[in-house]
């Protein structure tokens, strides 16, 4: 049996606010998507990233939002270190919380961490 990652979903409180963050990160999200309860973007690698304001309410009525610590760590790869620095500066300059400024990891990757509007820490990586 072969298992493959097909989709990653983010439950969001405010679709427009969340999509604005991910557009600034560099994702190509349709401009008319801000008022939708569910938005999907298929990435170049075939994985679909989706945002949803209604799924949890409709299919898991007893769901309680998680608290404390990482809920998940979506990671986005950029072309090079300069792109990581520029994207981090753009996002934090727009008021998004910089979780950790760009740094080199022990395994040679260059990354930064920024919190999206729903509290998910997003990794921005090159290398």
Where do the model's predicted regions map?
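Short glycine-/small-residue motifs
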Residues: 121-124
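Alpha-helical macromolecular-interaction surfaces
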Residues: 16-17, 86
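Conserved active-site tyrosine of GNAT-family acetyltransferases
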Residues: 18-23, 91, 119
